[in-house]
Amino acid sequence: MELSVSSPKQSVLSPPDCMSDPEEEHEISEEEDDDRNHKHRRKEETRSQSLEQDSSDQAFSRPYRKNYRHYENGNSFSEHEKRSFGTGSGQRVQFDNQRMRSNPMFSRDSGPGRGRGNYGSWAQRDSRFNPVDLSSHMVQVGSMGQGMFGGRGLAGVSAAQSAPWPPFGMIPGVPNGGLDGFHHLQGSLRPPLNAPLNMGIPRQRCRDFEERGFCLRGDMCPMEHGMNRIVVDDVQSLSQFNLPVSVPGAPHLAASSKQVPAQFGGASFMNPKGAHGRTNEGGMAVDGLGYGDAYPSAGGTDFYDPDQPLWNNSTGETSGAISTLNSHGVDENVAPLDDSNQDAAENGCGIRDSRSTSQSVWGRMKGSNSQANSKEKADAVLNSSAVPEDQLKEVSVNSSRHGKQNHVGESVAKVVDSSNISNDMMNNTRKPTQKAMRTLFVNYVPHESNRRDLILAHFQKFGKVIDIHIPVNSERAFVQFSKREEAESALRAPDAVMGNRFIKLWWANRDSIPDNGLSTGSGASMKGRSMTASGAQNQFPIAAASKSNHVSSIAKVPTFQTGGAPSSSEQPKPVVVTTSGPKVTPLQQKKADTLERLKETLRKKQEMLEQKRNEYRKKLATLEKQGTVVKREEADEPDAKRVKLDTASDSGAAIASPKTESSTDKKVPILKPLSTAKLSTETPSPDSKNFKQRPYSFTTSLNAPMVNRYKLDNRTTTIKVVPPLPTGLADVAVVKEHFSSYGEVSKVELEDNASIDSGKDHETQNESRAACVTFVKRSAAEKAFANAKCWQEHTLQLVWVTRQSNRESNNNNNNSNSLSVSRDNLSSKNKCASVSNDPKPAVEVKTSSTEEPENTNVSGDNDSTLDKQETKESDNDNNKSNHESIEGASEVIATAGTDEEQSEQIHQ
């Protein structure tokens, strides 16, 4: 509904309490001449919530809002009019000389009346209202709240400085049709900032804001956007504006039930900001809506559908209503390899000339259109190919000169500090190219699900699948359909791909099997990057094929040529479509040769690894076989045979020295770990299977030595000092002190006459005594046996004592022999012979030899060498004890004979 002004003259709008006589107008005009009066300037600041009027004539020649901007020369221009910087396109006001003296940022109230029965009290008008004939009989100004005409903009809902104005019935008696369209904008409006900020600093007008109606740089833009503007913090709130997309500068409010008239337009139609006011809130900032000179008809305008989501969940694309905004043609449906490159492409490819003034914040989001528009899109692409290249360069430089960009999904606006960086990024941006016609790119597929049969089972529901390419060891796949419609249906399917909602679908960059010989790739290479200009997704089949060793990938060399017409989700792009037959460019041929060389190298490496793997397996099997053979031989050897060999051993070898015995004991466990070390120090195989097998072979090879180390040692640790003991050694403390230097002594015993009478001769007592020293460890006993034979220049005779029973039997034999010798001197030699032929040592040898295998069997020892040596040691100990007992018996016999002779001499 168009609202017009009833009369160019002023009407009474002031509240009743502000009414004054017309004579006061001349007095007020005199006060206005003195604009440097401090009192009036203070009055101007305290009335920041009031509205401003330029003049009574201008109040009806333009919309009811502060629509004129001023320069230093005092000229004013209308925001509807396109102008060049430094010129004013508006009318000269009657108080032009006063405006030149006043601050251009804060033009004070002009015209007679200044709140005294005239329009002066409503001089500063809000941007949301239009020229309406507001007469005193229909508007009660005194009843209007401060929230309706508050300051330099309407109070926002989020940070309101006054009560919010209602959507309907704001002005009694005024139709609300013209205000229906923006009653829902209260949530996105912002309160004004303090007016004196940035006072007196004139800035240039933002060209984007003037020509296109909005500025994507938002609060980060250093240019001037006027006193009123709307800053949008998030993308979702843009749906409230319903930005037009097809017609340049066509600002419509789709929520309004009636068409907005042309004179309603203006770059700051709904802007609540104060002069140079800025909010520091990050995010996508739109300084104004795309409102141009006048509103064209909305017949061909595609509006945003609030019932349709901004993004399709299945494809990651925008809805069809928003997708037509994307006119720069940057390829964003495929995940880029370089985010910075993508950012530069998004910023740089936004063409800022008259052809792209309809591009808004939605311009960088790719959408999927209906199938009905696919032919129109294809024709538009072919027609746009005639755009001169130098014009594209000019537009790119113009866009990169600003050096700022904003992302839709981000909460903070990105600022590029240097224009050189932006220019460099623009040089590296990829050129727009067409998409594949029938091939879909499947990404984020789990490795276990990335199989040909599973992918085919899902996509064959939508149509005939003619090719599936799965790169090796990747989460990607390329599925090509026989028809374009089938691929689109699979792309727009609402259900999850293969039952996994994380799997995403995009259009691929090219078709593996070209269609009608059309090439969709430009084939141009970029400097500084080893990728084609067709986009980041071009590298996916190339990089994946370099890892593949399948023969089928050789047939996919035509992947480098793409075919087909532009997809329905593509926007018109200035590209050159080559309709000639498929060509193999030198770059593509070079890549194919490189791919073949890589595959050949990979095949040779795999053959070498397989050969090494087989060799390691053979070695491992041989070593395991050798270990099992040795164990079987040890287990099959009978115990009786070992006893027989031990008993038949030579007595000379049995009386081996303790040094050699100890050395052999120490050498045996050393040899075994050396043999096992050979198994454990093998060169590790690169195969993961061999790494798993190595710990097993290592533990099995060290199994026997580990058990032997903890084997129970039953060898004796008792040493006997054969009598006669030297004088002074027949004391337990002395014996212990002498032998404790070689190791820890657990027990010292003096045999025979341990408790003697003081009346007997000490020398005779020492001759009949023997000392038994028991050590804690066998090693200490061996050391003492080898080195403790000398005590104060006396030589000691040391023997091993195997058992307590053996010592007792020897003592009994010695006592019986001494008694028999005392009775008959002549039969002493026979007694000695009988002692030497005593069968007990032989029995003891057998028992010891049989006991040792039992002990080894209990401990689980399978080492025959250790068993043999232990058996020999026990035999040597027994033989030594036998010889010692024989020698002791002969000495006892000799001493008994001498004692008997002495007693006979005494009797005589």
Curated annotation (Swiss-Prot):
Coiled coil: 587-630
Region (Disordered): 1-124, 333-375, 558-590, 629-695, 807-908
UniProt keyword terms in alphabetical order: Coiled coil, DNA-binding, Metal-binding, Phosphoprotein, RNA-binding, Zinc, Zinc-finger
Keyword Translocase tagged: no
Annotated organism of origin: Arabidopsis thaliana (Mouse-ear cress)
Residue ranges with Acidic residues bias: 20-34, 898-908
Biased composition (Polar residues): 1-13, 48-59, 90-105, 356-373, 559-588, 677-688, 846-863
Membrane-spanning parts: none
Modified sites of kind Phosphoserine: S657
Biased composition (Low complexity): 807-828
Keyword Phosphoprotein: yes
Record-linked CDD domains: RRM1_RBM26_like
Biased composition (Basic and acidic residues): 630-647, 865-886
The protein's name: Zinc finger CCCH domain-containing protein 41
Record domain RRM: where: 438-510
Zinc finger (C3H1-type): 200-228
Taxonomic path: Eukaryota, Viridiplantae, Streptophyta, Embryophyta, Tracheophyta
PANTHER family: RNA RECOGNITION RRM/RNP DOMAIN, ZINC FINGER PROTEIN SWM
GO molecular function: DNA binding; mRNA binding; zinc ion binding
